[in-house]
């Protein structure tokens, strides 16, 4: 059997797809492009309406380009709207998230899907050719109730992988040659709460900080209230942990944060990122913001842009508000017009570009540890800057690079 996996969305979905691919390969299936595969698995996202649309377009394109293929759809869109997905061309099966990990076995043994409790999951088998970094999912599900978010309905309750399983996967990844591992989860900050053995996110990060092999761990997105002083201190002190944080802000006005049901204030967020910057002057600190949330007035939008300009952030992901039926925000009045949302998104993206420019400028002339990627002619630094280097070396090697060039066009050269 020839298979192809098409993935949309977050790092958790990417990790899920890698696990599916690894199990399919282990069961004798062969990877192929979507237009040549017997079976195409589409792993969908549903965080926004445009994510749903992108999945539908991809499925229709697969049906057009490979009319003989069987299309299996999984992920958050498939979980949220199974009948809608099942009606798309060539879709032979819709697999909800809590049965995703049985998919490879079903395909290769023709077993019927049984009931499942959606445990956090099967062990991965790392080793995808051409990759230097692995995304390792250690947690899934979310029990927060952000008023705009559909994900708790599609991913279910929070479930953590036990620490022995996580360490076993890391050992396998190191043996397979990976030198960077991104640790991810749907609500990573809740890691361990369901294990009932005292394990916490800090327990996990402390284990990573003391890992004996020369591997870099990159902690994926953390909610601000979960990024404790202890976690920040561990990252600052350990060579094993990348100086890289992603901390979703969502808005700068406490009134909007309360409407979004985000459990922190703008002042709390500012103190957090300023503490990180004080401890790690070269750290990458990314964030997410939502513009056009119901009830957002022009004054709120202006305050957001002003607040962002005062923060030591390095890059932004800007999300125009997307109405998700079934969420509290969907029932809110005072919706912002589409034209206003687009203008506000443009203003915030401009602020984000300025943050990135300032960060790039601060890094010119510095020497950073980096991993060679692609064919060895590119590097990714520990603080998440990707740039070409003047001469190629072997892929997947640790090097030191001196950063040159200009903001938006950084260039590295090997430092002695």
Language-model-derived ranges and their functions:
Residues 101, 144, 189, 254-255, ...:
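Glycine-centered loop/turn positions within well-structured domains
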Residues 71-72, 80, 175-299:
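Conserved SAM/AdoMet-binding glycine-rich loop
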């Amino acid at each position: 059997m020839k298979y192809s996996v098409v993935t949309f969305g977050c790092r958790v979905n990417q990790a899920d797809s890698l696990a599916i691919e690894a199990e399919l390969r282990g069961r004798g299936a062969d990877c192929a492009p979507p237009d040549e595969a017997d079976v195409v698995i589409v792993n969908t996202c549903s965080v926004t309406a445009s994510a749903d649309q992108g999945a539908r377009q991809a499925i229709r394109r697969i049906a057009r380009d490979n009319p003989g293929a069987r299309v299996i759809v999984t992920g958050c869109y498939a979980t949220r709207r199974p009948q809608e997905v099942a009606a798309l061309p060539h879709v032979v099966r819709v697999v909800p998230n809590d049965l995703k990990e049985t998919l490879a076995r079903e395909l290769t043994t023709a077993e019927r899907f049984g009931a499942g409790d959606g445990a956090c999951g099967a062990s991965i088998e790392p080793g995808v050719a051409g990759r230097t970094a692995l995304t390792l999912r250690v947690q899934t599900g979310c029990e927060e109730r952000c008023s705009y978010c559909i994900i708790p309905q599609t991913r279910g309750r929070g479930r953590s992988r036990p620490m022995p399983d996580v360490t076993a996967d890391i050992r396998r990844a190191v043996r397979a040659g990976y030198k960077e591992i991104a640790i991810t989860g749907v609500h990573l900050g809740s890691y361990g709460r369901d294990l009932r053995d005292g394990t916490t996110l800090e327990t996990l990060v402390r284990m990573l900080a003391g890992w004996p092999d020369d591997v870099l761990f990159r902690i994926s997105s953390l909610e601000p209230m979960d990024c404790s002083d202890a976690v920040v201190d561990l990252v600052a002190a350990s060579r094993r942990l990348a100086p890289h944080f992603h901390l979703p802000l969502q808005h700068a006005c406490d009134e909007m944060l309360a409407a979004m049901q985000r459990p922190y204030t703008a002042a709390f967020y500012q103190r957090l990122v300023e503490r990180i910057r004080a401890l790690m002057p070269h750290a990458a600190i990314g964030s997410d913001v939502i513009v056009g949330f119901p009830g957002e007035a022009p004054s709120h939008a202006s305050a957001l842009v002003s607040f962002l300009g005062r923060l030591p952030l390095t890059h932004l992901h800007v999300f125009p508000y997307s109405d998700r039926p079934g969420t509290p925000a969907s029932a809110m009045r005072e919706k912002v017009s589409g034209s206003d949302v687009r203008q506000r998104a443009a203003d915030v993206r401009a602020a984000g570009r300025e943050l990135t420019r300032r960060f790039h400028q601060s890094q010119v002339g510095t020497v950073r540890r980096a991993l060679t990627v692609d064919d060895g002619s590119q590097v990714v630094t520990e603080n998440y800057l990707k740039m070409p280097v003047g001469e190629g070396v072997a892929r997947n090697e640790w090097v030191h690079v001196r950063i040159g060039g200009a903001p938006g066009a950084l260039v590295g050269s090997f430092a002695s």
